[in-house]
Amino acid sequence: MLIIFIDADGCPVKDEIYKVAERYQLKVFVVANKYINIPANERVEMVVASSGFDAADDWIVEQAGPGDIVVTADILLAERCVKRQVRALGPKGVEFTEDSIGSAVATRELMQNLRHMGEMRGGPAPMDKKDRSRFLGKLDEIIQSLKRR
């Protein structure tokens, strides 16, 4: 059964995921280190992971399996998921695959080093309507491909 896991701390597309999951009648686990308000829906479940480092990520990796979807902006979590044949999707609609995850990890490390050296400040650009639209389209595409299996 296809399940969507949300790495929920700071995820900007939770509402969009809830709507898509409702349309397809899918189970959603909202995973975070602290309680987050979720819709009153029997298919949406809040999981508060322990407060340990990467506890939410670890829970997601342990629970998600092939045929599931993880929505995360955390590239290292996406890498762990891809290695387990779990579909990983970023909140801006970029799917992490076996072919793309290596360069995503390398880019993350480069940006982290540049920030550490003071060469760069700030983070990614804020979400806009195009990002949300791209995310919804890609999520729908992934769900359709998994349902055809």
UniProtKB/Swiss-Prot annotation:
It comes from Bdellovibrio bacteriovorus (strain ATCC 15356 / DSM 50701 / NCIMB 9529 / HD100). It comes from the Bacteria. NCBIfam families: PRK00124.1 (NF001095). InterPro entries: UPF0178. This is UPF0178 protein Bd1212. HAMAP family: UPF0178. Transmembrane segments: none annotated. Disulfide bonds: none annotated. Coiled coil: none annotated. Belongs to the UPF0178 family.
